[in-house]
Amino acid sequence: MDVLIVDDSPVIRQLLRHIIEEGGMRVIGEASNGVEALRCIARRRPDVITMDIHMPVMDGLEASRRIMEEYPTPIVVVTASYSLGDAVTAMQVLEAGAITVTPKPQGPSHPDFERDVESLLRTIRLISEVKVVRRFRRRQGKREEVQPPPPVNHEHEGFQPGVIAIGASTGGPVALKELLQGISRKTPCPVLVVQHISPGFLTSFCEWLNQVSALPVSIGEYGERAERGRVYLAPDGCHMEVDRSCRISLVNGNRDETLCPSVSRLFSSVAKNFGRNAVVVLLSGMGRDGAAEMAELHRLGALTIAQDPATVVVNGMPGEAVKLGAARHVLSPPRIAALLNELPVQSCV
């Protein structure tokens, strides 16, 4: 696998080169800014690009836009900063077509170095398999028309959704943003979200969502009762569950767990405590986290929705749900929001 490193720091480029080559991949070039990156890509055509955000001449955002317009290539944003400003820029880079964001390893002497290295290498290997498409900039002021949603299919008497549970991973932040932008403030029940995201990035991600979401977004706290018309994100390193009174429970994950928080754990608690009176959604993501539990919820009669493969970055989680016959509807994020807006307001817990 051929990797291009784009970072304005020679020290970071050297560190990333060492990590990537020790991981069995080939570094085919280095660039200190976006202009150099575009020249290198035109000549060498890497399989994956690691992209810094802040660089002179051309930053990571503009470079990613240009790359996805001219030479579509899987991009992983590698950043050392989790400030709100950088979170907003990182989300814009994802909207431009980058696949995911991961932390820069902090040097061999740092206690989390080995974990960060393994996370970076795993991310590079995984995104190399993603089929990216050419992205063109949307004209300012031009909004996509959202088709009307399908009717909420009441297959049983007394459908009363008490909770909306959403699972997402790679590609999920942008999909979640699009969904939350379209959802009504009159949403009849709490919205609980498990989004796989790099450790340390969640607080800024939450603040970024609050800038675009129609509903207030916060990080769930142990013992908190989830309220209608609010969105709760699972915290870093904790599985989030919910009981039948919508009280949030947090369970610390083991350090060696690959997925924590887990969509499966959230969906299992929803199945146990709400059964048919739940709405569950799987957005873009690698793997199959939550798919089997969505199938069980579908069997119980819950309203189950998977993101349309035409709109996902990675069709792992929603695609697996569709394969299992677990998705009652397969929709784009704006149409998912439109469908959620059709839920009966009086059915709230």
Swiss-Prot record:
<keyword id="KW-0378">Hydrolase</keyword>
<dbReference type="GO" id="GO:0006935">
    <property type="term" value="P:chemotaxis"/>
</dbReference>
<comment type="function">
    <text>Involved in chemotaxis. Part of a chemotaxis signal transduction system that modulates chemotaxis in response to various stimuli. Catalyzes the demethylation of specific methylglutamate residues introduced into the chemoreceptors (methyl-accepting chemotaxis proteins or MCP) by CheR. Also mediates the irreversible deamidation of specific glutamine residues to glutamic acid.</text>
</comment>
<feature type="active site">
    <location>
        <position position="196"/>
    </location>
</feature>
<dbReference type="GO" id="GO:0005737">
    <property type="term" value="C:cytoplasm"/>
</dbReference>
<dbReference type="InterPro" id="IPR001789">
    <property type="entry name" value="Sig_transdc_resp-reg_receiver"/>
</dbReference>
<feature type="domain" description="CheB-type methylesterase">
    <location>
        <begin position="157"/>
        <end position="340"/>
    </location>
</feature>
<keyword id="KW-0963">Cytoplasm</keyword>
<dbReference type="Pfam" id="PF01339">
    <property type="entry name" value="CheB_methylest"/>
</dbReference>
<feature type="modified residue" description="4-aspartylphosphate">
    <location>
        <position position="52"/>
    </location>
</feature>
<dbReference type="GO" id="GO:0000156">
    <property type="term" value="F:phosphorelay response regulator activity"/>
</dbReference>
<dbReference type="GO" id="GO:0008984">
    <property type="term" value="F:protein-glutamate methylesterase activity"/>
</dbReference>
<dbReference type="GO" id="GO:0050568">
    <property type="term" value="F:protein-glutamine glutaminase activity"/>
</dbReference>
<keyword id="KW-0597">Phosphoprotein</keyword>
<keyword id="KW-0145">Chemotaxis</keyword>
<feature type="domain" description="Response regulatory">
    <location>
        <begin position="2"/>
        <end position="119"/>
    </location>
</feature>
<comment type="similarity">
    <text>Belongs to the CheB family.</text>
</comment>
<dbReference type="InterPro" id="IPR011006">
    <property type="entry name" value="CheY-like_superfamily"/>
</dbReference>
<dbReference type="InterPro" id="IPR000673">
    <property type="entry name" value="Sig_transdc_resp-reg_Me-estase"/>
</dbReference>
<dbReference type="Pfam" id="PF00072">
    <property type="entry name" value="Response_reg"/>
</dbReference>
<dbReference type="InterPro" id="IPR035909">
    <property type="entry name" value="CheB_C"/>
</dbReference>
<protein>
    <recommendedName>
        <fullName>Protein-glutamate methylesterase/protein-glutamine glutaminase 3</fullName>
        <ecNumber>3.1.1.61</ecNumber>
        <ecNumber>3.5.1.44</ecNumber>
    </recommendedName>
</protein>
<dbReference type="InterPro" id="IPR008248">
    <property type="entry name" value="CheB-like"/>
</dbReference>
<feature type="active site">
    <location>
        <position position="289"/>
    </location>
</feature>
<feature type="active site">
    <location>
        <position position="169"/>
    </location>
</feature>
